[in-house]
Every structure is written in C-alpha cells, then in structure tokens.
From Swiss-Prot:
Keywords: ATP-binding, Cytoplasm, DNA damage, DNA recombination, DNA repair, DNA-binding, Nucleotide-binding, SOS response. Belongs to the RecA family. GO terms for molecular function: ATP binding; ATP hydrolysis activity; ATP-dependent DNA damage sensor activity; damaged DNA binding; single-stranded DNA binding. Can catalyze the hydrolysis of ATP in the presence of single-stranded DNA, the ATP-dependent uptake of single-stranded DNA by duplex DNA, and the ATP-dependent hybridization of homologous single-stranded DNAs. It interacts with LexA causing its activation and leading to its autocatalytic cleavage. GO terms for cellular component: cytosol. Residues 338-376 have a biased composition (Low complexity). This is Protein RecA. ATP binds at residues 66-73. HAMAP family: RecA. Residues 329-376 are annotated as: Disordered. It comes from Streptomyces rimosus. It comes from the Bacteria. InterPro entries: AAA+_ATPase (IPR003593), DNA_recomb/repair_RecA (IPR013765), DNA_recomb/repair_RecA_CS (IPR020584), P-loop_NTPase (IPR027417), RecA-like_C (IPR049261), RecA-like_N (IPR049428), RecA_ATP-bd (IPR020588), RecA_C_sf (IPR023400). It is found in: Cytoplasm.
C-alpha cells in the first residue's frame, strides 16, 4: 500500500513539473524514443570510425586541439562542408581573423551561404554564439579559436596589465549558458583550441589547452590532432600524414586513434583513407604495388589508386559503406544487409575492436604508371 502511495505521489509530482515547465521537462528514460545519434561526417572514414558513431555528434560541444599547422581548421572546414551538403546552416566565428575563403571553397564549403563573424573581443564573440544557437536555426557553429577569445578588459587595458583568469571565467559562463540550448536545437559547437605548456612540470605532459578547465568538462568529444609525417613527391612536400586521438568521448568508447593524409590545397584525402582501411579490412587487395577491388584493378601505387577512386565516386561510396557496415558505425540498423554465410560473431568482434592506426603511406609511384580501367 505504501508503495502505491509513493507511486501516486511521484506521478503527481511529474504531472505538476510538466504543467509548470512544459512537456518533456521530466520523463522516465524508457519513454524516450530510441533514435541513433545524429552526426556530421568528417572527410576521414578512419576518424568517423574512431568517433564510434560515424562522425561528430549533433547537439554537443566538441573541442579540436593540437599544435600549429596540424590540421585543426582543415578538419573543421570539412565538417562545415558536410553539414552544408546535408542542407544545414553553418556559422563560423573567426576570432583569429584568419579564415581563407578560397581554401574553404576548395574543401567544398559554400562560402556564399556560410554565416561569418569576426568579433572584436571574446565577450562579443560568445554573445553572438549564444544568440545564434538560441535561434534554433543552425546545424553547426565553429569558434576559431578559444585562444583568440580575448576579454574586453584585456584589449582595453595596458600591455603590462595582469588579467589572470579572465578568459577562463568568460568561457565557463558562456558554456553554462549555451550547452542546454545546443542540445535542444541539435546544434553542434566546435571549439578549435591551441596548446600551451605549463611551467615547472617534472612528470607527465606539460601541454595544456587555453581557456581554463570548463571546456574540458562541457565537451562531449575532444580530439587531439597531430602532424606525424611529411608526404613527399620526390623531394617536394605535398602534404602531411596526420594522427587524431579521441581523448574524450561521451557517445562511444574513447582513446581510439585514426590516421589520414592532408594534401596541400586539397584538404583531407578521403580516397586515401578508404584505400588504407579497405586494405586493413580485406575489401581492397594489395599485391606488390597494385591495388585491386573485387577483381578490378584500381591502379599501380597508392597515388594512382587514390586518383581512380576520386574519378569514380560511386565506387568510393561503395567501399566506404562496406567498411562502415563491417564495423557497425554510421549505418542505420535497417540499412544493414547481412550476406549469406557471413560470420556474425566475427563481425561483432570487429565492431568492438578499437580502430587501428594505419601505417604511414609509401612514397608515390613513378609518374609513368597508369591506373587500369575498371571492368565494364
């Protein structure tokens, strides 16, 4: 009897909360619709897999940080382009005043539709972010970068003035305000951040990010991006090999890594990543310098195979779909089509296995080699 009275009292409290704060203000978790997490894909299949859900989650705070020229803005611009291709609206808060529109166009960004703001100080930037997020009309908002969100007092003060903790307090207040609005409007906020070094650290890494600790706590995903190798065509540098580590992940298991190529003037090489993962998971066969897919030759050398996939986007999409289906990432359950005789246990084991780092690519093949045509 006591249990029944308690249940009635709880139901009455829930009803009162809904009347006062609106429907959905409180509910039992079993009553929530079980929908897959909506994502914005990156240009790297390996990173989508490492994130565990097929891309950057919607309605969350995401932090991307790393050393200078490591690919932070490039990775973010690819996410911007993919959000726009899906019909979304995107805003870019360029606090560094360094966005190159021509480079953004090369990565697929629709610069005519991109909402751009170049604020004068940190308070203005975060106030603009808050107003845009609360409009509910954005799919993605990018803040580049946290280090450039300089408080108004610091800008208006003298060069030698001390402003300890101002930026950290500014970030903490802003994140408290916008986090709930981001979730309700399904808007993703990507904060690009820089690295600094703590003085006097004897043990452990001295590296830290700017803006205090608030962003570390509020971020659902934190990605550490590093340049690990220079890609060369003979003696000419043509790009970088980049490694991303998911150091925090609230939507999937963390600490997974992904490697991909960033080519100068082109951005992330999606096709190069598909070749690496296709070979790793057995969809693309590598025999000597030749790459083949289901008996069709893609080309001699990775560069020719990459160009072949770039010229045949349907084939590239097919390879990507098979990789994601095998790993159970970024594919709706109803879209999965199990092949006869497939080893379900093996597929499940592959889905649970952490994403392995792809070894650095070999040097480009001789320029005289040509990609073979696919079978008609």
């Amino acid at each position: 009897m006591a249990g029944t009275d308690r249940e009635k009292a709880l139901d009455a409290a829930l009803a009162q909360i809904e009347r006062q704060f609106g429907k959905g203000a409180v509910m039992r978790m079993g009553e929530r619709s079980k929908e897959p997490i909506e994502v914005i894909p990156t240009a790297s299949t390996a990173l989508d897999v490492a994130l565990g859900v097929g891309g950057i989650p919607r309605g969350r705070v995401v932090e991307i940080y790393g050393p200078e020229s490591s690919g932070k803005t490039t990775l973010t611009l690819h996410a911007v382009a993919n959000a726009q291709k899906a019909g979304g609206s995107v805003a870019f808060i360029d606090a560094e005043h360094a966005l190159d529109p021509e480079y953004a166009k090369k990565l697929g960004v629709d610069t005519d539709a991109l909402i751009l703001s170049q604020p004068d100080n940190g308070e203005q930037a975060l106030e603009i972010v808050d107003m845009l997020v609360r409009s509910g009309a954005l799919d993605l908002i990018v803040i580049d970068s946290v280090a450039a969100l300089v408080p108004r007092a610091e800008i208006e003060g003298e060069m030698g003035d001390s402003h300890v903790g101002l930026q950290a307090r500014l970030m903490s207040q802003a994140l408290r305000k916008i986090t709930s609005a981001l979730n309700q409007s399904k808007t993703t906020a990507i904060f690009i951040n820089q690295l600094r070094e703590k003085i006097g650290v004897m043990f452990g890494s001295p590296e830290t990010t700017t803006g205090g600790r608030a962003l570390k706590f509020y971020a659902s995903v934190r990605i550490d991006i590093r340049r690990i190798e220079t890609l060369k065509d003979g003696t000419e540098a043509v790009g970088n090999r980049t490694r991303c580590k998911v150091v925090k992940n609230k939507v999937a298991p963390p600490f997974k890594q992904a490697e991909f190529d960033i080519l100068y003037g082109q951005g992330i090489s999606r096709e190069g990543g598909l070749i690496d993962m296709g070979v790793e998971h057995g969809f693309i066969r590598k025999s000597g310098a030749w790459y083949t897919y289901e008996g069709d030759q893609l080309g001699q050398g990775k560069e020719n195979a990459r160009n072949f996939l770039k010229d045949n986007p349907d084939l590239a999409n097919e390879v990507e779909k098979k990789i994601k289906e095998k790993l159970g990432v970024g594919v709706k359950p109803e879209d999965l089509t199990a092949e006869p005789g497939a080893d379900a246990a093996g597929a499940a084991a592959d889905a649970e296995a952490p994403a392995k780092s792809v070894p650095a690519p070999a040097a480009k093949s001789a320029k005289g080699s040509k990609a073979a045509a696919a079978k008609s």
